[in-house]
């Protein structure tokens, strides 16, 4: 949908559906169509993901999730649709492995404890990531083309690395103190995952 920040959520369900439908289909024509759709989905997702594979000469490594949106930039980051239209023009900034139907800023905004607001802030970014990972894993589980199955797992692995890299280097856990104290610095997972709808930590568990 063009006007929901749960973008990617539906494509994850779609991948799960076509993978499971393929596994039980008996009609050769239907099975051929499903095969074509699965193959196209995986190949095009990988092409999109590869736009984030950017080597940084200064760092002498790939640009990673931890490098995306330094704190000063994060604090000023906007969540409007107009801002998102600008963000999506630069996938090379997202960090190695990011793949989603919405810019990486959507995941980063929750580190600033931005509330659920479909127009101006966030709506369960990691929940949508989870749905896409689940869809890719279902393809790898139910499809019978090894090359495509391996590619689906590779996409999921690289996105998983993005999540790990971002969480490991840019977030932490602080449970004590007042909420203002716990939110004084960006990236406190104790607060991030406790936000109604915006967080939805269960989506990634």
Regions found by a protein language model. Name each.
Residues 1-205:
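Glycan-recognition and catalytic cores of secretory/periplasmic carbohydrate-active enzymes
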